[in-house]
């Protein structure tokens, strides 16, 4: 969501994103400008990461420790612990390919950039979707729901999202859920500062007459 801050009657409210995922991506962004995110704002890893609520007042607590998450899965569905570990190994591999080899190295001018030796080896993951992959591994509906929801942050449905995007599950369970100590607006202020250092000028509450590309 859009990171905003609302102040009223002496109170300050953090508005927008619920949590801070993929801290390595933020770190890389600031490093591009010779900055360290840790020098600009402080983040704290949440433990537990979050709790998922279901009907009938049932809930599942998601720990910040992947080993504990595996135990939680195993307690809910026998045999699911080992399946989750293998699933996350694949998700981590996909994450490193998507972020390190694709996001940072490809200019994004053509879809043909996505075709290389590594992506060809994962071609089968583009032929099925998150929904089918998760349902094929896990029987319990709660576990299925937990594993399917991260792709919603991509603005997509599990049934329409290629299984390659299970790297979002690694972002969730592997990298964990974080929160900026003073709210997300600290991240916004840091980005504004960098933009201004690069010569960007911000015109607020102004009409847009033209978009130059």
Give, region by region, the residue ranges found by the protein language model.
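Flexible loop/turn segments at secondary-structure boundaries
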Residues: 1, 154-155, 210-211
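N-terminal glycine-rich phosphate/pyrophosphate-binding loop and immediately adjacent elements
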Residues: 1-96
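General beta-strand structural signal in soluble alpha/beta enzymes
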Residues: 15, 145-147, 204
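Alpha-helix capping and helix-loop boundary segments enriched in small/acidic/polar residues
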Residues: 17, 159, 178-182
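Active-site substrate-recognition segment that forms the wall
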Residues: 39, 158-161, 193-194, 210
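Helical element adjacent to the flavin cofactor pocket in flavoenzyme catalytic cores
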Residues: 125-126, 135, 166-212
């Amino acid at each position: 969501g859009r990171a905003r801050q609302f102040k009223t009657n002496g109170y300050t409210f953090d508005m927008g994103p619920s949590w801070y995922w993929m801290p390595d991506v933020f770190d890389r962004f600031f490093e591009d400008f010779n900055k360290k995110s840790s020098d600009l704002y402080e983040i704290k890893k949440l433990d537990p990461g979050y709790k998922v609520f279901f009907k009938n007042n049932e809930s599942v607590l998601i720990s910040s420790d992947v080993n504990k998450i595996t135990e939680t899965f195993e307690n809910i569905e026998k045999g699911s612990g080992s399946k989750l570990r293998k699933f996350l190994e694949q998700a981590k591999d996909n994450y490193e390919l998507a972020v390190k080899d694709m996001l940072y190295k490809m200019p994004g001018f053509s879809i043909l950039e996505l075709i290389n030796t590594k992506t060809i080896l994962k071609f089968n993951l583009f032929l099925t979707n998150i929904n089918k992959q998760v349902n094929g591994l896990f029987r319990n509906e709660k576990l299925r729901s937990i594993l399917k929801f991260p792709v919603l942050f991509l603005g997509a449905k599990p049934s329409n999202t290629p299984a390659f995007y299970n790297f979002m599950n690694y972002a969730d369970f592997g990298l964990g859920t974080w929160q900026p100590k003073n709210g997300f607006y600290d991240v916004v202020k840091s980005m504004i500062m960098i933009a201004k250092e690069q010569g960007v000028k911000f015109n607020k509450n102004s009409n847009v007459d033209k978009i130059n590309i």
